[in-house]
Structures are given as structure tokens and as C-alpha cells.
């Protein structure tokens, strides 16, 4: 019976919470946002998408966000296809 009470309490505490993820935000066609080494631009872009913060990842010269909502679209493994939704 104690296990049932513990599980019920844990379920109530986690109800309504959102998980967060990190990644490259994307626009149409699974295309990431180029940043040209501008950290301020990426931080603003990420916060507009409800992330905690963001920066310009120098290896790819693309914006990378920390703490995006779980429903936010991030870059997958496919190619960028401009013009496709």
C-alpha cells in the first residue's frame, strides 16, 4: 500500500511539468539558423522560441539552444530542404 501512495504522490508532483531539450532550432525545411559567430543573435533567437539561452556554435556556425520546450522543432539528421514545410 505504501508503494501505491508513493507512486500517486510522484505522479501528482510531475503532472503538468514540461521537459526541456537542447539542439539547433529549425525553420521551414529542417534548416537551422546560421549565425555568423554572433552569440547575441542566437541568444535572442533561442529565447524567442522559449529556450533558456543560446549561442553560436562555432564548429557549424549555427545557433544552438539550451532548454527548448519539448515540443520545439530541432535539427535532425536530414538535409536542409528550403521551400518545404
Swiss-Prot record:
Signal sequence segment: 1-19
Chain segments annotated as coiled-coil in the UniProt record: none
InterPro entries: LCN-type_CS_alpha_beta_dom (IPR044062), Scorpion_toxin-like (IPR003614), Scorpion_toxin-like_sf (IPR036574), Scorpion_toxinL (IPR018218), Scorpion_toxinL/defensin (IPR002061)
Keyword Glycosyltransferase found: no
Family assignment from sequence similarity: Belongs to the long (4 C-C) scorpion toxin superfamily. Sodium channel inhibitor family. Alpha subfamily.
Disulfide pattern: 31-80, 35-56, 42-63, 46-65
Modification Proline amide occurs at: 82
Tissues/organs with expression: Expressed by the venom gland.
Any single Gene Ontology cellular-component annotation: extracellular region
UniProt protein name: Toxin TdNa8
UniProt keyword Disulfide bond present: yes
Originating species: Tityus discrepans (Venezuelan scorpion)
GO annotation (BP), single: defense response
Molecular-function annotations in GO: sodium channel inhibitor activity; toxin activity
